[in-house]
Every structure is written in C-alpha cells, then in structure tokens.
C-alpha cells in the first residue's frame, strides 16, 4: 500500500512528514536536512536544481533561479526560462516532486497521497493553484488545510484533557496568519475547531530581509557613491547576506556584513564591510511588526473571546524567532509563547497527522476548519451580497433566492466574489457564468436559487437554478491561474518526462563515479603488484587510459564500453597476479598450527 505524507509548502522552506506507527516523523531530505529551501534553478546544461543545490548557485545564476514563488501562486505571474514560460504551479511542483522523491527514498515505497498546507488567509485561487501544483508533481492531494490549523493539530493533541483555546501566530517567509482554535477533549478523542482566522498574505520574513537590503544599498551609495540596485549579482549577494544577518540578530545584538568585491569601479574593486545592530533592525521594521496587530485583534473580535481566555500561544514559522515578534505576542496576549514546538516543522507534522486521519491511520481526532473570507455574488449596483460569511466552518453549503432586475430578462450573469468589502469592485473576482433560458416575466417575478458549496479543501462550487423552468448552470472556481484540465495534464506529463530525465542524469553520474572508482582500483592493483609480467601491465594500463579518456569526454556509451573492458582486463590481470604468487617460493603459504607457549597445547 502506498504512503501518504504531510507537506508544508513554504515561501522560504518546505518540510515533509509522515506517520510511522501512528506517530508523526519529519523526513530528512537527500542532503540530510529536515527543511528544504523553496528554491528552483535551471542550470545552463538544462538540469533542474531544487533546494540547497539551487540556493547555493543563485549568485552565479541569478536570472534562472526562482525563490519565494509561493507569493505568486494563484496569479497570472510567469517566469521566462529560455524559450519556455513557467507558472507558479509548475515551479511549486518541482519543490513538491523533490519532497516526494526524498520521502520515497526514506520510506522505500511509493508516495501517492498528500495533505498540503496553505496560509489560512489564502483565497480560492491560491488554494486551487496549490492543489494543481500537487497534481503536477504526481500527488493525489487528499486535502488542503490551513497552516495554523495544522500547527494546532500537532500541538493540541497532547495537551491535557480539558477543552482549551489555542492561539496560533504564524509568520512565515511570505505570509502571515493568526488563528484561534478550540481543542475539545472527550476521553481518547479530540475535536479541533477553528473559531476564527485572519491574516496578511503579503507580509513575511522576506519583507524584513528587504528592509536590510534597502538599508545596505542606501548606506553603500552614501559611503562609496556606487549604486548596487541595478546589479543583479550584487543584489543576490545582498539578499543572502541580509537573510543571514536577520538570523544572527535573533540571538546577537549586532551582525557584521562583509562582502568582498561587491562592485567594481574605475579605481578597482569595492568591498562592503558594515555592521547592523538589533536596535537599528527593529527600528527599520517597526511598521511591519505593527501590521501583525490588527489581524490578531480581529480574530479575538470575530470569535467573541477575551485575551485572558487563551490557554496556549503557539508561534509558527521561522520569522517568529525574531525577538521583536515574540515580545509583541507576549505583550498582546499577556502569555509567554510556547517554546516546545519547532516553528519550522510543526505545520508539516500537523499535515502528516491529518493525512493519517484521512487514511484511517488515526481515529482519535476530528478537524473542523473555516473559510477565511466571505463569499457572495454581485447584485444590482455592484453590491457584494454575501452568501457565506468568513469564519464559517467547512465543508458548508448555503442557498439564497434572487430575482431579475429587468422585465423579460432572458438570462442572468452570476459573478462570484470573495472578500469583506461592501462593493464587488473592491473584492476578488473568482469567476462568472451565465444562467440562460429564463421564461419572459416582469422583473422581480422569476426565482433564481444560487447555491454556494465549499468543500473540505476550501474550494468553491457555485450553481444557479431557475425554479420556474428548472434550468440549471454551475461552475467550480478554478482559481486565478485559469489553468484548464488540459494544461494541468500537460504539465503533469512534462513533470513525468522531467523525472525520467533526472533519473537518466543520475544514472549517468552514478556510472561515471563507478568508472572513476574502477580506474583508481585498477591503478592501485598495478602499483601493488610490481612483479607481474610487463605485458599484463601494459594491457591493463591501456584499458585504464581508454576509460580515463571516455570519462574526460563524458561520453555515456564510451564509459559503459570502457568499464566493461576494464573489468575483463582487471580479472585477467588478477589471474596473472595469482600465477606470479604461486611461482614465487617466498610467497607460498605454509600450513601450521599455532602453539600456546604457556601450555604447550595446540589450537
């Protein structure tokens, strides 16, 4: 039976976890690390690099390296690489494919199913696009769940026997969410219900990094007169240095940034050597921190809960390691945030638990999530008429009857929106469809029943029915990406083809490594056996030289032929070694017993 995994597809890093014996375990990647950078690069020879290998070469391959793609998921953003345009789904699928491969390598069996997490405040387009990315990667996406919900699931199951409120403060690399969850306990069963959620999909650790970058560029311009902002390679180096400085400032009061040869002027190379203090960093990012307060207060207001009712505060996302963030949470809640969870891993652990629940491996928990934004349709005057309010538990289904605005109106256009504003022009348009064939009648007489159905993934299905004629029309919101099933199928096929290419490339590398090892062994064999006749040595050396040339030329067929030939001549040489040893009296083996001198007994 194939396995199901939980995946935290993050802006900066991604993590995969699995249930083993009913307990979640984070899987280390092929490089031995428990987190994988969400970075994809296309090398000059056509190889696709993902994770640490992609991140390490970013400075020398800026134009073909993509990071933080999660910030574009569900939009029409594309990245031109060579003669091909890549969508956020395709880039995300590369990351998911690596996590899938690493999990399969660890488990020793196929991984087909996955629960993938998204920020709680992701809209329908972003959720649908994430699901598509999973499909392109060859995964059956069992469920899309919210990151704070997953974190609460991982954290809340082992917390006592009482009903408790858990506040999850999730500040990742590119998104921010706050969720309030209620954990209900009943003997050996837990119910985790989201009471309210809020957030900002354009706020994350990347924004803190950018403030350091801007400061460095400005400071360098003032001190040297050199503007680095148009130098792509310099900016990539600044980006990496800024991220590192941010991390250092979580535990130190200052960080030194040294970047030799950052630029070249008429006078020669220019170096960067500067220090940023934690106080400076917190001052330049205080407005970003301020933006986290309103979502926190909105959640308490939505749930009708006072702050003193919160039992636990959980910090999620690597950005919560910044002292200013944890201090703010402590001030706002009056509680010390829990330090017992790994903010980088807890979301993937929760996703693995949910995968176990959906596969029947865990039967002790029920997860009830909510829709983060209100859903409705446009009515006369551009009014946003809500059918499903935000923070409604999902899955859910709601219907409402509308009528025509004009006499003898033959059709109605159903425009679906998501958001909290009063006018549709200020909300997110999810799609439009027509209900035709309405019988001629005075305005206000026809009855058009509009139904919204949100599934457990938070993905929206809408239908409209003329109650008079029985005519019905429906649509599933396919996301802002607008990918058709044919396009998704094409991308899946391309991903499969690429997987085969990767497999062949790895096989060629393995073959080359094996050939180099064989050359080393054969050369050592000659060196260790000087007494073997010269003819045998010459024959083996000729095959060694031939294989070396094939390796140098990187010719797959020549390496294979050369390896086979060297193996045969190596065996022949070994036979000559044996014959030489047999003829040499000094090398002959003497059979004897070992005698114990103390007892005189033989052994």
Swiss-Prot record:
CDD domains: ASKHA_NBD_HSP70_DnaK-like. Residues 593-603 have a biased composition (Acidic residues). InterPro entries: ATPase_NBD (IPR043129), Chaperone_DnaK (IPR012725), Heat_shock_70_CS (IPR018181), HSP70_C_sf (IPR029048), HSP70_peptide-bd_sf (IPR029047), Hsp_70_fam (IPR013126). The modification Phosphothreonine is found at residue 175. GO terms for molecular function: ATP binding; ATP-dependent protein folding chaperone; unfolded protein binding. Residues 578-603 are annotated as: Disordered. Induction: By stress conditions e.g. heat shock. This is Chaperone protein DnaK. The gene is dnaK.
